[in-house]
Structure formats: C-alpha cells, structure tokens
C-alpha cells in the first residue's frame, strides 16, 4: 500500500495532481491512500486513481490503525514535521526531500525558488518515477442545479494581504455584467460578507452571491462549466487551470512563477506587478495593490480571445476512473 501525505488546501491538492498520477501509473496494482482534510473529499474524487482518503487536518499524529505502508510519500513539505509524521508509521520506504534533522538523508535537496508543480515532479523523478507536469486536468463533474456559463468572481483569500480591494473587484464585476456576463461571487462561508459587499457595490442581484452556498465539489463544478474566472492567488484559480476555464489571476505577494498557471496556456493569465518589498500587517500587498481595474479588464479580453481561438478542446472528462486505470 502507498500512503501519500498532502494535508493542505484546494490549490495544494491541484498542484499535486501530476505527482499523484505519476505514483498511480508507477504502482498500478497497489492501493493508493491520500492523507488530506476531510472537506477535500469531493475534490479528491475528481482527481482519479486514489483508492482511499485518510482524513487529517494538517500535521500531527495520524490516527492510523492499519499495517505499515510499503511506501510513504511526502508531498506535503520539506520536513521535519511532515517527514516525522510519516516515519512514525514505519513505512518500508519513505520518499521525501532530504532533511537530516528528520533523518531523511537520501532525498533530493529542497529548492525555494521553484514552481509548486515542478517541486513534486522533481522529487519523484529523483526516485525514478517520472511525472508529467502538464497533467493537471480534473474530472469534469455534472453541474446539476448550478448555473453554467457564468463568470466567477472570487474576491477572497486566506490572507488579507492577498485580497485585491473590494471596490476594484466590484468595478470589474460591474463592467463585466454590463458586457453581458452573468456574474456570480463565490467564497467560503466565512467570506460571505466579503462576497456580498462586492456584489452590492457592483449592483448585482442578491442571488449572485454563492459564497458559503457550495462545497468544494460544487465549486469545482461551477468553475468547470464557467465562462470566466477572476480571482486572486487561490485554489479557485487552480480549478480554472484544471478545467481550462478562461481565467485572470491576481498575484501578490508570491510570484506566479511559483504558483501560477502554465505559461503556455494563453487562456489563463496571471497578473503580477512585483517584485515589491513585503509590507507588515494585513494591508494588501504592494505587488497586488499596484494592479488596477483597467489591467484586469484588458487581461479578460485577452484570455477570452485565446479561449475562443483554442483549436483543440481540452478533454472534458478528465482522467479515466480508477477501474479503467489498473
């Protein structure tokens, strides 16, 4: 059995998909279990190839009662905490970045200046398991009662310094609605007031606010069938990449070279005005604050044109189900 640790969020899971697929291909007859937060379960189902999810919210003791895994893979971080969490299970072999403090001395070195997708592909390649960094697509879920063809504006982010100002998001939403877009505003339950403020300032109807009304699987379905996504450096942007939905992503303080969409896909555009010196406190980071409404609207025009010109549609169904992969 293969146990993989990636106990993080939406964007973290999405950027780990190529590595997960590589492990599935390398060990087709083995059970593959993924350690991830329970609330990510609907999204884990869309990855394909994962037999079982082990629920864990971050690092710490893992309630594991089964036999020691034959192989444990740390796709979570550079250690030492994540290394020790897996080592405590006494796996037959541990694949991880080198971290002498945690007793891991045979792995590749960690590089801070590296795209998150490439980081885990490189680690597996070091151990002889090649991964395709472009293998980012997720299975496209049925939208059910969710609206299709909408423009998703997602103003939230975990850190307030990564949130573009409400008046600017509202100005973009107002302009796009005026151009004929059906705009919806998404977010977590804790971001409902933020989403409502954007919608109100943009003159959108109350039912345009979907923040807190969707779980992560429904959010994925909404993005999969959307016309456009406008958001910051968040998991929603990674969902847009996974479904080839046209997107404009606003970055800061982290550069898109570390977390952005593939640069060879012009229907996704990452805007970044950095580098700028980091500022303390919750204020919007200068690299993000430097982006104006005209910058975003111009990028919208470019990504929609690129999406319309795309000659070969991205496969709609995503990876085949597990039953056909083994």
Regions found by a protein language model. Give the residues of each.
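Catalytic machinery of carbohydrate-active enzymes
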Residues: 1-326
């Amino acid at each position: 059995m293969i146990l993989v640790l990636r106990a993080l969020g939406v964007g973290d899971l999405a950027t780990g998909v190529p590595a997960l697929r590589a492990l599935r291909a390398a060990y087709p007859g083995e059970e593959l279990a993924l350690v991830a937060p329970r609330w990510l379960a609907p999204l884990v189902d869309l990855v394909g190839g994962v037999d079982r999810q082990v629920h864990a919210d971050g690092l710490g003791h893992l309630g594991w009662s089964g036999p020691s895994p034959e192989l444990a893979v740390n796709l979570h971080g550079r250690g030492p905490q994540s290394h020790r969490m897996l080592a405590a299970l006494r796996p037959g072999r541990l694949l991880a970045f080198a971290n002498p403090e945690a007793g891991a001395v045979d792995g590749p070195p960690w590089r801070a200046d590296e795209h998150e997708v490439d980081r885990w592909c490189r680690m597996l390649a070091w151990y002889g398991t090649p991964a395709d960094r472009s293998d980012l697509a997720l299975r496209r879920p049925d939208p059910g009662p969710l609206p299709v063809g909408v423009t998703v504006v997602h103003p939230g982010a975990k850190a307030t310094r990564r949130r573009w100002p409400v008046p600017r998001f509202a100005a973009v939403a107002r302009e796009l609605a005026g151009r004929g877009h059906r705009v919806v505003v998404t977010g977590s339950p804790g971001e409902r007031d933020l989403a409502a403020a954007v919608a109100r300032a943009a003159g959108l109807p109350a039912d345009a606010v979907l923040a807190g009304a969707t779980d992560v699987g429904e959010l994925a379905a909404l993005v999969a069938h959307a016309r456009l996504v406008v958001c910051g450096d968040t998991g929603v942007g990674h969902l847009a990449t996974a479904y080839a939905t046209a997107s404009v992503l606003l970055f800061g303080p982290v550069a898109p070279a570390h977390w952005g969409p593939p640069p060879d896909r012009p229907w996704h555009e990452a805007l970044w005005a950095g580098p700028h010196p980091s500022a303390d406190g919750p204020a919007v980071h200068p690299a993000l604050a430097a982006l104006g409404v005209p910058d975003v609207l111009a990028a919208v025009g470019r990504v929609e044109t690129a999406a319309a010109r795309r000659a070969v549609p991205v496969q709609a169904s995503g990876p085949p189900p597990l039953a056909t992969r083994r």
